[in-house]
Amino acid sequence: MNESVTVRGKDRYKSGVMEYKKMGYWEPDYEPKDTDVIALFRVTPQDGVDPIEASAAVAGESSTATWTVVWTDRLTAAEKYRAKCYRVDPVPNSPGQYFAYIAYDLDLFENGSIANLSASIIGNVFGFKPLKALRLEDMRLPVAYVKTFQGPATGIVVERERMDKFGRPLLGATVKPKLGLSGRNYGRVVYEALKGGLDFTKDDENINSQPFMHWRERFLYCMEAVNKAQAASGEIKGTYLNVTAGTMEEMYERAEFAKQLGSVIIMIDLVIGYTAIQSMAKWARKNDMILHLHRAGHSTYTRQRNHGVSFRVIAKWMRLAGVDHIHAGTVVGKLEGDPATTKGYYDICREDYNPANLEHGLFFDQHWASLNKLMPVASGGIHAGQMHQLLDLLGEDVVLQFGGGTIGHPMGIAAGATANRVALEAMILARNEGRDYVHEGPEILAKAAQTCTPLKAALDTWKNVSFNYESTDTPDYAPTPSVSV
């Protein structure tokens, strides 16, 4: 169906139930404006439901429609405010699923509010009965809307200047075990890891303020460790102090205490919610603090490819919201992420402009209107033996976090940190010399290990350990041959 079937005139407002595609939510001739917000949904209609009607229903229920005609539409600029589904395509290699392109007038959204944006785009419509499943795959956010957001509080360039670290990925580690350590022992882990050569250590997502370690105790021991490690190494160090708490008042209190102790970075979890994230981002910019976001909880709605929200959308929202770091996948680690999709996430974080790239899952051009860049973080199941792969796949502007790959080292935590630092420095040197470090990686590491016992022990311990499972979320596109004329 390529023509509009919208009912016009007085018949449009007759009382009763009308198909969404006839109410103006299906407009195949519509040309999206530069100022429109565009959403791409993967729609899976119930058996027997017309995909055009299902897609029009998504447009309607995520903008101005309800289940019946209401005469109060005539008191508004109804034709302007209706979301318009203008294109529906079958999803390649996925029978019964359709890509629905929907345009929303910018006036439908409050400036600078992820909460308001998401209330429409992923609100009630996700429970709509005529749909088996619904997934928000991607969005095009107009420059006029992007400019209403703060963007990353610090950004990659200023973070590197603040840390005085250039020309290589940053190195970190999550303290393990994530729960159960006393404050004193927690601080010992932080000191050993930083002294051994890491740039950062990190609280895990669920370490807040528990009976075995109060948050204030953790902050004090951690910052004592940071200061000692800085004095011992002559380098600037940091530890992500997780300020996540039950209320905003408590989070602000913890953040202020971290600032008083001289921390350069604090951390929050995605589960605190979009408004809380934006609030902490504003605090971080005001107080010259790097803000790390752990994406705890995201896989509950990002991992399944037919229902939920793609992580590429969450990455876009978090760049708008103003965090400086976000976990974005490792490819070779233990967590979900295929190479092409993960590359798309990293592009969203680090580029000023994202051209559409279906191979990477990017359906739209996206201009970031000079917002600061967001530093992606790779963590979960990575180790020194993968350094050449990580540098090749993820690039230079990334934090590589080796938690188990540092703290699980057979010679101890400091040795684990040293192994990772030496492996990285060896790989960066090889890259700068123009060597084919991707294919020569194992040889480069083996040579570096000849003069670094901790690296040799790491390579002997983890060898070729990798987590090679089929990804559940891969790009949907069908390559077609080009014809040269």
From Swiss-Prot:
| Gene Ontology annotations of biological process type | reductive pentose-phosphate cycle
Give the EC number(s) under which this enzyme is classified.
4.1.1.39
Q: What class of enzyme is it?
A: lyase
Among SUPFAM superfamilies, the record links this protein to:
RuBisCo, C-terminal domain, RuBisCO, large subunit, small (N-terminal) domain
UniProt GO molecular function: magnesium ion binding; monooxygenase activity; ribulose-bisphosphate carboxylase activity
Q: Keywords of this protein's UniProt record, alphabetized?
A: Calvin cycle, Carbon dioxide fixation, Lyase, Magnesium, Metal-binding, Monooxygenase, Oxidoreductase, Photosynthesis
Q: Name one Pfam family in it.
A: RuBisCO_large_N
HAMAP family assigned to the protein according to its UniProt record, in alphabetical order: RuBisCO_L_type1
Protein name according to UniProt: Ribulose bisphosphate carboxylase large chain
Please name the source species: Rhodopseudomonas palustris (strain HaA2)
